[in-house]
Amino acid sequence: MSTTRFSSGSSSSLSTAPSEEPVEAGVLEVVAELVTELHGASAPAAVTLDQSLERDLGIGSLERVELLLRLEQAFGVRLADEAMMAAERPRDLARALAAARPAAPERPPAPRAPLTPGIAAPVAAATLVEVLRWHAERDPGRTHVFLRAEDGTERAISYGALWARALAVADGLRERKIGAGDTVALMLRTEEPFLAVFFGTLLAGAIPVPLYPPFRADRIEEYVRRQLGILGNSQARVLVTFAQAERVAAFLRRHAPALAEVIPADRLARPATRRPAPRLAATAPALIQYTSGSTGDPKGVLLSHANLLANIRAIGEAIDIGPDDVAVSWLPLYHDMGLIGAWLGALYFGIPIAIMSPLAFLARPARWLWALHAHRATLSPAPNFAFDLCVRKIGDDELVGLDLGAWRLALNGSEPVSAETIERFTRRFAPYGFRPEAMCPTYGLAEASVGLTVSPIGRRPRVDGRVVSCGRPLPGHAVRVVDTAGRPVAERVEGGIEFRGPSVTRGYFRNPAATRAAFRDGWCDSGDLGYWAEGDLFVTGRRKDLIIKAGRNLYPQELEELVGDVPGIRKGCVAAFGVADPAIGTERLVVVAESREASPAAREGLRARVLERVVTALGVPPDTIVVCGPGTVLKTPSGKVRRSATREAYLAGRLERRRSARRQWARLLVRDVVAELRRLPDRATALAYGAWVAGFLTVAGPILWILVLLAPDGRATDRIVRRWCRAVLALAGCRLRVEGLEHLPARGAAVFAANHSSYLDTPVLLAALPADFRFVAKRELLTTPLIGTIIRKVGYLTVERFDVARGIADAERVTRALTGGASLLFFPEGTFLRAPGLLPFRLGAFKAAVEAGCPVIPVTIRGTRRILPAYARIPRPGPITVTVGAPLVPAGREWREMVRLRDLVRAEIARTSGEGCVENRATAS
């Protein structure tokens, strides 16, 4: 492996830990240089191989991409896609570089010679097994799948080869007594073993249950928790995995009672016998697809062979799939769009499909387009963010010679479709042969197998205002829009979307309650809102109340067990629950934990250890941690924690008062009577003020809720919320002063960047700023009862902080909003602490501003931390000042410009607020 020579006169001011390995030393130097550039004088004194890129060095997802690109340039190698996504420490990067191949430009692949036209689809087949056997018997040597590697090389899999491998897998499963009605979990990547194991499971008469594979070591506990929920619901008897995931799979086996065996896919197959394939009924289960965003009670969509074939055939009829079509997909096979919409659809119609890893696309989006070019592909589905990613992340130099002229349908679905994305993608790639009518917005969901509506072929996307048409129902399917009573509404009247047809699930696996809730008179409730216009369905948003925090599920019992393992906390004496914050309507995660420690210092140390433990395991910090004495957590006579009762006691203020009173009575009553008496007036005033605030919020909160629910979406709801915030602050005695309003732009989009020090910051900004702006909030706020409703109705944007692919899509959506003229407000710190100090700023806001060419306006909030600091329940009156700074205009579109703007804004806010900068984010992560 050839590497560049690292100069001893590096511009980095950080020292690097001694290393005997040149690769490790080089990695440390590149990392140190980037960290110095990001954090300047506040950077850590040294970079070591085992520091966390994110927690210790402040290198988030955006910064990581920049770091990895620099490493590739410095070492002259090409890093593997998986290594790029999974690296958590400099040592991981060094190992990946040591194993990397020398860099070579990814040469555009030469177009493949077209295959001979396929044969007609098996219209008489009743099951997926019959479909594969039909093709394997009639044309066993014909290529079914081209598996593309990172370097663009491909390996062909024929129908006959897939059938033979599936038979061998089926024999391996039968040897393990797996048969009809059993479930088999597939924790496999988008690779060849998935194909054979999926059909081998069906050939054994069992039901495949796809699970997404682990790929982030620092998220493994959360991953295990989610998969255990699915394994428990599905009652899978065998888990088929790959070598790198065996350790995780073994852990799952120990904690999933029904799971009898974990086996790597390469050790599952047995020499195929002549045993005939089972005769399966069309109504037999063919797949359990667990919906993304499942709650603590996972919902597995049970689909039969008849459901899947009906959906595939209806899609084929709607988009006129024929023997001359060729497909390309980078979608994961464990997701319904990649599994059913891409692979199984291509299988049924006998058309070749090129399949590549999702990581290959995310790392270098141009690979998708070059795969289309190489195969002269006509069909390729993808979520909306993929099209936007291509526009944003592919350079012109990567497109030389590209030809997309054969691409007749770009099926855009699986998430809301953006008119701006469609327009930009079409304009950008028109010179390369992409036609406007090739963009085909669709709508579907797991409960309908995958597809439900599709735009007519040959028609340009239809846009109504800013909403993109999702087309018309698939043949044989019906869709209606209804009011809350289930009555169909008129055209252009928004309502709930319901559907029925042969593709629709029979219900949720082992979850009759969820099944009953989803169906009404034969119609399945999608949980979405939309309207009809000129025969087209326009989907406007979600209605389902998905209980998700930061893209993951939080289970109280498991969180309590996690906290109970902290030394000094009484095991079994922990309560975790969520409470609504009446000040801003959001929900806070509260942990109440008993300890025998009595001193305030010891309890503060326990709080810090609990915070560290939860953040390390879950990636989401509790908003409030209460460490209290024995007997505080309420329980039933049998010893079960009464979370609701403990929550009520917490909300009523009985927990801290009870603890505080006992401590003061036992330790201070005799010695500090005089001091206690001197504090009584202040305490009485605080309690009286707290009671006053709680009283009017008890009245004002429900009023706001009702007004928000009744108000139209958009500006009307925004005005109501702003007026409510002004009224509440006035009633609370919080005098609000605003400075610098002359700096607000008269027109055009802008990025507002504000410091974050209290839960009051959001209502304060809504009350103070007359500018028309939209907040950019963390996605987990959508799960809270009131704030989630406000976010959706006003049109605030949300971003995913933990899921890489979704986070990229959200970031692109933010930039699109700015480009479209919307002003956005960010809290670049992302969180706040009780102690004063400006936390490190994340780059997201400044990246969006640079890409959109919008000015950044610093906004400083003073006073809210004193009025309602972190962990406080009772506010106190006081003045609040909001200062709007002068706009800062981006001077370019480079990486350094993002860093420059971030540093200038942070320095200005630090100066105006009077608070120093805090450079260690770990305590707030």
Model-found features: residue ranges?
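Non-catalytic C-terminal accessory region of glycerolipid acyltransferases
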Residues: 1, 651, 680-684, 808-925
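AMP-binding/adenylate-forming catalytic core of the ANL superfamily
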Residues: 373, 380, 501, 506-507, ...
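Conserved AMP-binding/adenylate-forming
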Residues: 408-410, 417-537, 543-546
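AMP-dependent adenylate-forming
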Residues: 131-157, 285-288, 295, 444, ...
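AMP-binding/adenylate-forming catalytic domain of the ANL superfamily
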Residues: 78-97, 584, 615-640, 654-665
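Conserved pre-ATP/AMP-binding loop-to-beta segment of ANL
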Residues: 140-143, 270-290, 296-297, 302, ...
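Conserved AMP-binding/adenylation subdomain of ANL enzymes
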Residues: 309-326, 336-378, 393-398, 478
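Conserved AMP-binding/adenylate-forming core of the ANL superfamily
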Residues: 145-196, 216-223, 279, 300-306
